[in-house]
């Protein structure tokens, strides 16, 4: 049974996940960059990757990109979070603000989607997020 999957982030990880999942599911790819969104919707890869380009050209994909995160998350069964978490070696710190923002938006729209984090996060992040939001769907 096909699922509706929202993928947050159209970088290498997010675009790869969205492309593969779109073979058998309805995928809504979310990004803040209108250029990336337009490229995906026109079946052009916004990143240079031989396999993604090949899939775009040769495969039937149920893949649509948008900058409207709220609408995408609202209808999703799953939300794959693949947004940047830059590491600052001087502070020994991962900037998880983009991950937190996606989680907050999913909760704000009332989605019951299972959230899957593919971004690099520090040890204990998921447990802390579950405790903070009172929900095990992360």
Residue spans for each PLM region:
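NAD(P)+-binding Rossmann beta1-loop-alpha1 motif at the extreme N-terminus of oxidoreductases
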Residues: 1-44
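A structural signal for isolated positions on well-ordered beta-strands in alpha/beta enzyme cores
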Residues: 6, 28, 64, 114-116
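A structured beta-alpha segment of the ubiquitous adenosine-cofactor-binding alpha/beta core
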Residues: 52-77
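Short acidic/histidine-rich motifs immediately flanking catalytic phosphotransfer sites
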Residues: 74-78, 110-113
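N-terminal FAD cofactor-binding segment of flavoenzymes
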Residues: 47-48
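Hydrophobic packing residues within well-ordered alpha-helices of enzyme cores
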Residues: 40, 56, 129-130
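Short, well-ordered coil/turn residues at beta-beta hairpins
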Residues: 75, 81-83, 118-119
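Rossmann-like NAD(P)(H) cofactor-binding subdomain of soluble oxidoreductases
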Residues: 87-137
């Amino acid at each position: 049974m096909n699922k509706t999957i929202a993928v947050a982030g159209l970088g290498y990880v997010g675009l790869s996940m969205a492309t593969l999942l779109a073979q058998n599911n309805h995928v809504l790819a979310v990004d803040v960059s209108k250029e990336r969104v337009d490229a995906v919707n026109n079946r052009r890869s916004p990143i240079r990757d031989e396999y993604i380009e090949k899939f775009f050209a040769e495969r039937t994909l149920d893949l649509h990109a948008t900058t409207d995160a709220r609408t995408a998350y609202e209808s999703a069964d799953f939300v794959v979070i693949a947004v940047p978490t830059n590491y600052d070696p001087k502070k020994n710190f991962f900037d998880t603000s983009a991950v937190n923002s996606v989680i907050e938006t999913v909760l704000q729209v009332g989605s019951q989607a299972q959230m899957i984090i593919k971004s690099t996060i520090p040890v204990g992040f998921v447990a802390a997020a579950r405790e903070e939001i009172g929900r095990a769907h992360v």
